[in-house]
């Protein structure tokens, strides 16, 4: 799955009425964090172009390692 598929998944979560952003989180590559990974609720970010905006931080989409449903544990995207 490339960036195109990743953006499709994110757009669906952000804009489709059947999905709630607060039910999902992204795991990103975050150097210095435990195992260099950090989980962020999609309710706390904005999607702008090829970036997630988390407060004042721009996170390039290529840093997303995983998208998962917090309630069910379902993994919608996992970087190879």
UniProtKB/Swiss-Prot annotation:
Per the record, the domain of life is Archaea
- Coiled-coil zones: none
Pfam families tied to this protein: MJ1316 (PF04457)
UniProt similarity note: Belongs to the UPF0248 family.
Q: What is this protein called?
A: UPF0248 protein MJ1316
Organism per entry: Methanocaldococcus jannaschii (strain ATCC 43067 / DSM 2661 / JAL-1 / JCM 10045 / NBRC 100440)
């Amino acid at each position: 799955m490339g960036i195109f598929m990743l953006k499709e998944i994110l757009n669906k979560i952000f804009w489709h009425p059947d999905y709630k952003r607060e039910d999902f989180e992204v795991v990103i590559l975050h150097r210095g964090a435990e195992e260099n990974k950090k989980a962020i609720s999609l309710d706390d970010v904005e999607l702008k172009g090829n970036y997630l905006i988390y407060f004042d931080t721009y996170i390039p989409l290529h840093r997303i390692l995983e998208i998962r449903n917090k309630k069910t544990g379902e993994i919608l995207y996992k970087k190879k």
